[in-house]
Amino acid sequence: MRIVFVHPNYHSGGAEIAGSWPPAWVAYLCGALKKAGYTDYHFIDAMTDYVSHEKLAEKLRELQPDIVATTAITPSIYVAEETLKVAMEVVPNALRVLGGIHATFMFRQVLEEAPWIDVIVRGEGEEVLVNLVKAYEADNFAETRRQVKGLAFLDGDEIVSTAAAPTIRDVDSIDPDWGIINWKNYIYEPLGVRVAIPNMARGCPFTCSFCSQWKFWRDYRVRDPKKVVDEIEKLVNEHGVGFFILADEEPTINRKKFIEFCEEMIARGLPDKVKWGINTRVTDVKRDKELLKFYRKAGLVHISLGTEAAAQLKLDVFNKETTVAENKEAIRLLREADIFTEAQFIVGLDNETKETLEETYRMAWDWQPDLANWSMYTPWPFTPLFQELRDQVEVFDYSKYNFVTPIMKPKALTRGELLDGVMNNYRRFYMKKALFHYPWRGTGFRRRYLLGCLKAFLKAGVGRTFYDLGKAGYWGPQSKDKVDFHFDETRKIGNAQMADWEASADRAAKAAERREALRVQGKARAEERNAAKAEAAPILTAGGGGCGGHADGSDCGCGGKKQQQVDEFHVPMACGGGRQQMAEDEFAMPMACGGGKQQMEEAEERLVRPAE
């Protein structure tokens, strides 16, 4: 069974500024296949190698695979669809498989616009792919595919989605095959060294309304830190990796395991060989302020903070549990620990104005992070915030959903003015940094790293790839009214996808009604219990029982403590700083407290909606 994986040839002016990133997904899938006994797999990185459709066709003809598989995030979905169309034309007997976050949630749309796709893998891919390959090897695949969990496909005119596959419980069993990667192609520009993107955990327990990772991975699972360091040691010693970024949404959530990870890195002497970076939350930085220098000793040199917005209003919209003041304090703490800070700002919401854009610049300069990024709000079509803002979304050309193209149009700005405002922030921030900070502050590694970051920005700017400025035709303030983002206006939401959204909205409304009924019922029962307690209080007091127990003072079984009453419908919910998780059936749905504001909609949806 020969399997060929293809990374789609999609480019934007965002993350590529810092270098070429190795597609970790293929290493993890190949590791699962290898463990299951499938070793005849190949990889074509059409993105890094700029492989055209014609060249891809040649490679597929040469390899003659039994299965061609690719993946897609939202902006690369059309290229991924075209990749499998090429496969259909040159190796028509090969099974064509698509995975990734976009296809997982938008499979109806994808199958409607690209019916040549044979199978979509939904959700976490390792176990689902192995089961799919086994089913494809067996006879009568048209029938056996219906028994494989985590798939979607067309059967005639019917869009079929099988039951959701459970998440991988034993994350320590994950063993990626990094040997599938051609490492000389993946360089981290600021340091000029090979870069990797391993992960320490799967999932995220928070429910930020603009993000979809918590929906895709579902529950939060952390690997054994020693096994993660085993993997990193292999990347360093066998593949020459000199820098890595933990792919986790927030690796510091589990403080104990993150500390163990750092201790293991130090014990093996790895900080002298490899540096690394993470994304994390401001609250975790403040929590661990006494440990930041220890983290730096373990090789952690770069932290990207989701400050998200200068205006507190925006933080509230995004369901962030931080304040503007906390953002500034976290950056100060990291600076004192000699850890490079990168502040992330989201711009382009409906309430954006010239004044709010200017405010983000002023705060960025006041906070003094080493780096600052302004990303366009991108309404992933499968997030809660997209559903709330759907009437305001005018662009459904997903190839532009890349954080650098203004998908949303603020009421007070044109898209060209929004882009110009963002570029004005970049120009001022990095011009000042280049003249007064980077060359003169610090020595050795700090100076080299900052100048390397500046070089990466300049390289992208001169090449007109930064923020896709060349494609948009932006040359400065004088061109803001002439920019063209080349939106494909023929792209619309598919009928099947729209019908599913409407059905989901109806289910959500019914769930909300049930929650309200339960709330009223619970309140009434509480009042009844309180009334009963008040009526019985004199008798119980006279009896002398410590909790209102037996008259002779003997134990009534409650241990002298208030006993919790459990209604028919009881959901365990605790304000643990956003870290409480709730399990329902085979799902473990993360629940974020948001400072006491629990979000139940997703969990309720799991209860009332059959698994697809």
Curated annotation (Swiss-Prot):
PROSITE patterns for this protein: B12_BINDING, RADICAL_SAM
InterPro entries in alphabetical order: Cobalamin-bd, Elp3/MiaA/NifB-like_rSAM, Methyltransferase_Class_B, rSAM, rSAM_horseshoe, Tetrapyrrole_Bchl_Biosynth_MTs
Cofactor needs: [4Fe-4S] cluster; adenosylcob(III)alamin
SMART domains, A to Z: Elp3
Keywords: 4Fe-4S, Bacteriochlorophyll biosynthesis, Chlorophyll biosynthesis, Cobalamin, Cobalt, Iron, Iron-sulfur, Metal-binding, Oxidoreductase, Photosynthesis, S-adenosyl-L-methionine
SUPFAM superfamilies: Radical SAM enzymes
EC number: 1.21.98.3
GO CC terms: cytosol
Pfam families reported for this sequence: B12-binding, Radical_SAM
Coiled-coil spans in chain: none
Keyword Heme: no
Record-stated family: Belongs to the BchE family.
Its biological purpose: Involved in the tetrapyrrole biosynthetic pathways leading to chlorophyll and bacteriochlorophyll (BChl). Catalyzes the anaerobic formation of the isocyclic ring (E-ring) in Mg-protoporphyrin monomethyl ester (MPE) to yield protochlorophyllide a (PChlide a) via a six-electron oxidation and the formation of an oxo group at position C13 using oxygen from a water molecule.
Protein name, as recorded: Anaerobic magnesium-protoporphyrin IX monomethyl ester cyclase
Source species: Cereibacter sphaeroides (strain ATCC 17023 / DSM 158 / JCM 6121 / CCUG 31486 / LMG 2827 / NBRC 12203 / NCIMB 8253 / ATH 2.4.1.) (Rhodobacter sphaeroides)
